[in-house]
């Protein structure tokens, strides 16, 4: 029977997730199974028994610690997965309460639930969720969490209640998780799969000293039983918790109406990786507590709250092989070849593994079932192996000793480097084609007609010997290629377009020329800084390491890489060829533009209507300012457009003046005296 098989499968995964802290499928795959079971029971209500996995909260408590009853049940949350389902939930709520409600929008932390009980302000018990009625006592371990006070603070406006039961989420910050994994892999142990499971296992250590070393954190997000105080709203409850010294999220917002809720959901869907911990959705709650009581709850979840789950960014798949790629600077990078799997709306079959040390740190073997993540446009990443799924047939990856493209012996550039490189920079076929393709990239010369296949064809046909020959290409040499030649032997339309693109690219600004040279560590930010400081390729070439390092935004590592690059004869030959072909090597300062931002550091975050990202940076640089990438106390202004990231919040925290786009335009035209700090409304 389908229901029986599905229920047993869900129960097994619940056991692995909640009790063993060792799941073998992703959260998204589990959600899909549970949803299928719920839909089956919706069609056949007689199947919905009290012990069905759809009716239980969590997977039951583990037996390692003393069972303890919660004062009030710890309910779970129902989930929605798209805006239509969210609107349908809100419609059901507002049919009962009336329209135009205030909702609280909270980030949904991907952690483990914890219940704290305070009597007369002192912590007396901490317990895991368990089955919602009975959990396990982890008081000693909870006391090691920095965010959990042993005694509540006097609340001023909010007197400390006689009895307080508060719920929250225990989690690991991503940086702490990475540090923990690095440490245990160095000891020869397999890495942990993800922060959530690691937090759960850390909370249930028998030795509290082990828990203390794990650097767990906590955010409070709800109340159980409370005596001596009744909050009028969820928002007020959070103010009270904060006054008592309990941690609450700084990302919670109170909004009116479901449209505003959907805006918050969309915002955090785009910015979920701007937070120090993992989130997997938004929790939306009716704010007014009297309405919460009216709406009530089902056997497992409140009707006044819902979890909007973002599309899964993690999945499990089979690691078929580990191969290596040679990049434009000679770096040899292992990458994973996997059975294709759909994540975040796209099919993923390959992911970088960075270097041999990273393969070892992650503990992955060829043949493993692995967990992979793809966050929006971010390159897919292998998180680690599902150790419980191993069969014994897996094998270790061995890094090659010679370049797979040219056969040159591989070696680290200097002792202690994690990366190994092919030293045959000048003629290694892989490095050549990657450099030619890089010249055409959007951050360099932005040559639309020169794609990856074109780069390969130009080199293989002999039309060019290296990137130095690009700007001297003519019709005769293009006719030696297959890609740019028609069947009748004439130049194709794409060939003509390539020649036009190359001619136009000769007049690109100096910073783009610098990026196109493939100097290690020199991306658009450093290139802009060098071009603004020195103004010509000749002056950059002649500058000392100290002079280069003194450039704001460059520093010693980039300076050394630039100076070293210009000591190589064939590198200088590329510059000479480009110069001879008419590529502009000097930035002529437009004297008509006033230096209104001389010495000021400006950060732009979010999308502006009248400026592209590069356009905003160039406008700042042209006026003598620095287009910085991060906010600090030295930042003069932060310009905030649509959908700003964490930089806006950082500016608020540091008291840095915030401008909208209109203020930015005035700042460019008239300087800092003409603008006042403008803080956009948060939603």
UniProtKB/Swiss-Prot annotation:
Its EC number is 6.5.1.2. Its cofactor is Mg(2+); Mn(2+). Residues 592-681 form the BRCT domain. The active site is at 108 (n6-amp-lysine intermediate). InterPro entries: BRCT_dom, BRCT_dom_sf, DisA/LigA_HHH, DNA_ligase, DNA_ligase_AS, DNA_ligase_CS, DNAligase_adenylation, DNAligase_N. Keywords: DNA damage, DNA repair, DNA replication, Ligase, Magnesium, Manganese, Metal-binding, NAD, Zinc. Zn(2+) binds at residues 403, 406, 422, 428. It catalyses: NAD(+) + (deoxyribonucleotide)n-3'-hydroxyl + 5'-phospho-(deoxyribonucleotide)m = (deoxyribonucleotide)n+m + AMP + beta-nicotinamide D-nucleotide. GO terms for molecular function: DNA ligase (NAD+) activity; metal ion binding. One of its GO terms (biological process) is DNA replication. Belongs to the NAD-dependent DNA ligase family. LigA subfamily. DNA ligase that catalyzes the formation of phosphodiester linkages between 5'-phosphoryl and 3'-hydroxyl groups in double-stranded DNA using NAD as a coenzyme and as the energy source for the reaction. It is essential for DNA replication and repair of damaged DNA. This is DNA ligase 2. The lineage of its organism: Bacteria, Bacillati, Actinomycetota, Actinomycetes, Mycobacteriales. The gene is ligA2.
């Amino acid at each position: 029977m389908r229901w029986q098989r599905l229920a047993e499968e869900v129960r097994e995964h619940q056991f692995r997730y909640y009790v063993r802290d060792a799941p073998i499928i992703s959260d998204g795959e589990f959600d899909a199974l549970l949803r299928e079971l719920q839909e089956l029971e919706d069609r056949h209500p007689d199947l919905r028994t009290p012990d069905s996995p759809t009716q239980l909260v969590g997977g039951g408590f583990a037996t390692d610690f003393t069972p303890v009853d919660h004062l009030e049940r710890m309910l779970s949350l129902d989930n929605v997965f798209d805006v239509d389902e969210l609107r349908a939930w809100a419609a059901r709520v507002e049919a009962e309460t009336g329209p135009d409600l205030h909702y609280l929008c909270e980030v949904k932390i991907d952690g483990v639930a914890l219940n704290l009980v305070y009597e007369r302000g002192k912590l007396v018990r901490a317990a895991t969720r368990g089955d919602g009625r009975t959990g396990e006592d982890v008081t000693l371990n909870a006391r090691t969490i920095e965010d959990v006070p042993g005694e509540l603070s006097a609340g001023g406006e909010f007197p400390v209640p006689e009895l307080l039961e508060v719920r929250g989420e225990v989690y690991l910050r991503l940086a702490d998780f990475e540090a923990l994994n690095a440490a245990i892999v160095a000891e020869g142990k397999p890495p942990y799969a993800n922060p959530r499971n690691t937090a759960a296992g850390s909370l249930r250590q028998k030795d509290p000293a082990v828990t203390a070393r794990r650097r767990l954190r906590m955010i409070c997000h709800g109340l159980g039983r409370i005596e001596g105080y009744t909050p009028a709203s969820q928002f007020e409850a959070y103010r009270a918790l904060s006054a008592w010294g309990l941690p609450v999220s700084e990302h919670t917002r109170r909004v009116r109406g479901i449209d505003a809720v959907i805006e918050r959901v969309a915002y955090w869907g785009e910015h979920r990786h701007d937070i120090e911990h993992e989130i997997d959705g938004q929790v939306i709650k009716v704010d007014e507590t009297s309405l919460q009581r009216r709406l009530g709850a089902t056997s497992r979840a409140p009707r006044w709250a819902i979890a909007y789950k973002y599309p899964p960014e993690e999945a499990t798949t089979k690691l078929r092989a580990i191969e290596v790629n040679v990049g434009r600077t000679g770096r040899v990078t292992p990458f994973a070849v996997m059975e294709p799997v759909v994540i975040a709306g796209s099919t993923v079959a390959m992911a970088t593994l960075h270097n041999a040390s990273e393969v070892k740190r992650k503990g992955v073997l060829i043949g493993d079932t692995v967990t992979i993540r793809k966050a929006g446009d971010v390159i897919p990443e292998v998180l680690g192996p599902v150790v419980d799924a191993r069969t014994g047939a897996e094998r270790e990856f061995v890094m090659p000793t010679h370049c797979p493209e040219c056969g040159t012996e591989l070696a680290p550039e200097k002792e202690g480097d994690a990366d190994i490189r092919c030293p045959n920079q000048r003629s290694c076929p892989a490095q050549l084609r990657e450099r030619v393709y890089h010249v055409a990239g959007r951050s360099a010369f932005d040559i639309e007609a020169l794609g990856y296949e074109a780069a390969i064809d130009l080199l293989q046909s002999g039309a060019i010997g290296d990137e130095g020959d690009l700007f001297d290409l003519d019709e005769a040499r293009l006719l030696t290629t297959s890609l740019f030649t028609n069947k009748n032997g004439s130049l194709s339309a794409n060939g003509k377009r390539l020649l036009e693109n190359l001619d136009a690219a000769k007049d690109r600004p100096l910073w783009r020329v610098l990026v196109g040279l493939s100097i290690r560590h020199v991306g658009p930010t450093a290139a802009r800084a060098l071009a603004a400081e020195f103004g010509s390729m000749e002056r950059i070439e002649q500058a000392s390491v100290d002079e280069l390092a003194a450039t704001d935004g460059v520093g010693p590592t980039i300076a050394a890489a630039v100076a070293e690059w210009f000591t190589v004869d064939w590198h200088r030959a590329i510059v000479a060829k480009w110069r001879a072909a008419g590529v502009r090597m000097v930035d002529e300062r437009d004297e008509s533009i006033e230096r209104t931002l001389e010495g000021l550091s400006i950060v732009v975050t979010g999308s502006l209507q009248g400026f592209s990202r590069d356009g905003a940076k160039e406008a700042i640089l042209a006026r003598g300012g620095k287009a910085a990438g991060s906010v600090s106390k030295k930042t003069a202004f932060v310009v905030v457009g649509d959908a700003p990231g964490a930089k806006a919040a950082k500016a608020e925290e540091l008291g840095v003046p915030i401008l909208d786009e209109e203020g930015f335009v005035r700042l460019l035209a008239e300087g800092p005296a003409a603008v006042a700090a403008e803080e956009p409304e948060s939603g």
